[in-house]
From Swiss-Prot:
Source organism of this protein record: Blochmanniella pennsylvanica (strain BPEN)
Gene Ontology terms describing biological process: ATP synthesis coupled electron transport
Protein name as catalogued: NADH-quinone oxidoreductase subunit K
Gene Ontology cellular-component terms listed: NADH dehydrogenase complex; plasma membrane
Superkingdom of the organism of origin: Bacteria
Keywords: Cell inner membrane, Cell membrane, Membrane, NAD, Quinone, Translocase, Transmembrane, Transmembrane helix, Transport, Ubiquinone
EC number annotated for this UniProt entry: 7.1.1.-
GO molecular function: NADH:ubiquinone reductase (non-electrogenic) activity; quinone binding
Segments passing through the bilayer: 4-24, 29-49, 60-80
Membrane-topology annotation of the record: Multi-pass membrane protein
Length: 100
């Protein structure tokens, strides 16, 4: 069995990578990918704790989080598609300048 500290370290590293993707990139698609990485890192922490405690609650929470993440992805990708059709770019700075 993997030690708890190693598993949490992996989850924290994934969360930080997602956060860096959100902060550094200015493209909406990459920001959404970073958000999904962060959500999956948090969901994996539920599984890690549930596995450590010997309960299935962590796995149930993971299924719930993944379901919510899938619906969030569907809505955000639909909005992303509409933004691209209207402004022909996914760059955040260009879209915020076109406010009117």
């Amino acid at each position: 069995m993997i030690p708890l500290s190693h598993a949490f370290s992996l989850s924290i590293i994934l969360f930080i990578l997602g956060l860096i993707a959100i902060i550094v990139r200015r493209d909406l698609l990459f920001i959404l990918l970073g958000l999904e990485i962060m959500i999956n890192a948090a969901a994996s922490a539920f599984v890690i704790v549930g596995s450590f405690l010997g309960q299935s609650d962590g796995q149930i929470m993971y299924i719930l989080v993944i379901t919510l993440s899938a619906s969030e992805s569907a809505v955000s990708l639909a909005l992303l598609l509409q933004l691209y059709r209207r402004y022909h770019t996914l760059h955040i700075d260009n879209i915020s300048e076109m406010r009117g």
